[in-house]
């Protein structure tokens, strides 16, 4: 099915088969579709509503065209979410990654510039002095030696360049907002993935199952975050042993009080980094930044197999933060990545 026929189909609210979606996505990502066709298709698909089969097929094409990071490790985990929740929180998933690595996890963190917050993971890491221009082999070394490597999305998904213009001009959510976290270049089989709306919690777990993931938690909180929240219960779809279980969790289940997120919002990358450091520092009886990171890092520690239960994962995260090793891990990654910088970049 060419893109003209695909546009006509989705406008009539007809679902595409996986094979049809793969053909259309391949045309989009190899420059065979015009910007107008790309925009028309994405909007038509959004209005119809993307299906699990369509999202899975699109992710398969993106994965096939990406620059891979080959890690010979088990239980590699990612903490990349969709963004787009409007919460303007500091970068919780990035802070969580340092905690998971400090707990013994192997984190292949995939991310880019800002979407929902005023600064994305790449913005915060740059602010922390971490070099992002790594090739696949250098990312592997980071994961193997530090326990955490960051894959800057544009470095690994060059085929996305054809969709960048239409996406910016439309300035509305499309299937691509979902695809980023589904296309980890290291093919991480374990994942905590936040989504921007509750309606995507179960379907995205089904997509990840179809893509071969092993243990994942897809989350969205009642207060609208693409994170596990400290201010409200959070919806979860957990994929484990080939089965998907849906449930709700509350911070109080883990001994963390319900509390406002107003004080952990960030206006820019500098403020976000300050809150990341506050979270990893872990000091103070009242520290909402620490608490939200402990919850989300605990989930990643659980899905990566370090902990047998989510509660145990949160306890491990709290111990790691309290011990100060996560804060040191950030400095270690900054020093390690700077070794890969060319003289012109210094």
From Swiss-Prot:
Keywords in alphabetical order: Amino-acid biosynthesis, Aromatic amino acid biosynthesis, Glycosyltransferase, Magnesium, Metal-binding, Transferase, Tryptophan biosynthesis
Catalytic activity as recorded in UniProt? N-(5-phospho-beta-D-ribosyl)anthranilate + diphosphate = 5-phospho-alpha-D-ribose 1-diphosphate + anthranilate
Look up keyword Membrane and say if it applies.
no
Q: Kindly give the Pfam families that the UniProt entry links to this protein.
A: Glycos_trans_3N, Glycos_transf_3
Chain positions recorded as 5-phospho-alpha-D-ribose 1-diphosphate binding sites: 81, 84-85, 91-94, 109-117, 121
Q: Which cofactor does it need?
A: Mg(2+)
UniProt: anthranilate 2 binding residues: 167
What residues does Mg(2+) 1 bind to?
93, 227
InterPro entries reported for this sequence = Anthranilate_Pribosyl_Tfrase (IPR005940), Glycosyl_Trfase_fam3 (IPR000312), Glycosyl_Trfase_fam3_N_dom (IPR017459), Glycosyl_Trfase_fam3_N_dom_sf (IPR036320), Nuc_phospho_transferase (IPR035902)
Instruction: Relay the cofactor remark from the entry.
Output: Binds 2 magnesium ions per monomer.
Q: What's the Enzyme Commission number for this chain?
A: 2.4.2.18
Q: What biological-process terms (Gene Ontology) are attached?
A: L-tryptophan biosynthetic process
Q: What does this protein do?
A: Catalyzes the transfer of the phosphoribosyl group of 5-phosphorylribose-1-pyrophosphate (PRPP) to anthranilate to yield N-(5'-phosphoribosyl)-anthranilate (PRA).
Instruction: Describe the family membership recorded for this protein in Swiss-Prot or TrEMBL.
Output: Belongs to the anthranilate phosphoribosyltransferase family.
- Indicate what this protein is called per its UniProt record: Anthranilate phosphoribosyltransferase
Q: Which organism is it from?
A: Marinomonas sp. (strain MWYL1)
